[in-house]
Amino acid sequence: MFRFDKEQMVIEFAGAKFGGQPGEYPTALSGTIFYSRHKIVEDAKKGIFDKKAAEALINKQAEMQDITGNSAFVQVFGGTEEALVNYIDFVSEVWDGPMLLDSTSGKARMAAANRATEAGYANQCIYNSINVAAEDEEIENLTNSDVEASIVLCFDPMDPSVAGKLNVLNDGGKTKDIGMLELAEKAGIKYPLIDVAVTPMGNGAGHAVRAAFAVKAKLGLPVGSGIHNVPSAWDWLREFRKGLREEGKDQIAKDVHHVCDIGANIVQTMTSGDYVLYGPIDNAELAFPAVAMTDMIIAETAKEMGTVPVAEHPLNKLI
């Protein structure tokens, strides 16, 4: 383990505290709710869902936060403006910690930022995300909102290298004429969470993992990713699981995906990650112990270099 020479930013936001030197603060964990084909969703366009089941999932993640000391985020996904607004209104009623405003639709993200501002809970919200594809209209909308935290994606489709990821943050790289950090600052973002943009295995997954070190070493900013997507996009694993099912080993086929899915978060944590978007919130009881264990090993090692873990660190809670 190691310490960065660069002073490391610590983000304190909506009750969560993360960032800093490896071993200082536990990794923050973000579980996604209302994702595509989530069984609790009854109408994905209108945002109709089983409220009792949704609250139970959010409460279970909060319980895991209390047990391990790892801060929890709720990543709220909605495919339409109506759905995302309905979802975040509900989440703000049952959860007072950080929540991500997430959608594949820019219009939906804009509507969510506006609603959070209007309803007075923008101080809980993390925009997902500021990236090279963001339109001027969306950035202007974000600027006019009260949202002050955002995922900032360091991905340049023209240059997926580690240098390319740093360049897109600093000067826009080969795709934009403005760096993503400057764009975030212009949009009123005070709390940038750098996402190293993990791509599939064989197409730059390793570059993204290495970029986590580079971002912290060069910029001192909190980093993380949705690295759990790597196993989902792994063709070999898909075929391997198919073979297991054909052999009648359905449970092993499920288990091997879970092992790789949760294990991916350990990779990000070990490579100086400050937060992970671990996937379905349903997996909180799997993700939190795995990442907490990793945090404990990192913190115990980092003590020899003078890094003192905070009181609520898993190393102080789970031994």
From Swiss-Prot:
Pathway(s) of this molecule: One-carbon metabolism; methanogenesis from CO(2); methyl-coenzyme M from 5,10-methylene-5,6,7,8-tetrahydromethanopterin: step 2/2
Keywords noted in UniProt: Methanogenesis, Methyltransferase, One-carbon metabolism, Transferase, Translocase
UniProt xrefs under HAMAP family: MtrH
Organism of origin: Methanococcus maripaludis (strain DSM 14266 / JCM 13030 / NBRC 101832 / S2 / LL)
Transmembrane segments: none
Protein's name according to its UniProt entry: Tetrahydromethanopterin S-methyltransferase subunit H
Example GO BP: methanogenesis, from carbon dioxide
SUPFAM superfamilies: Dihydropteroate synthetase-like
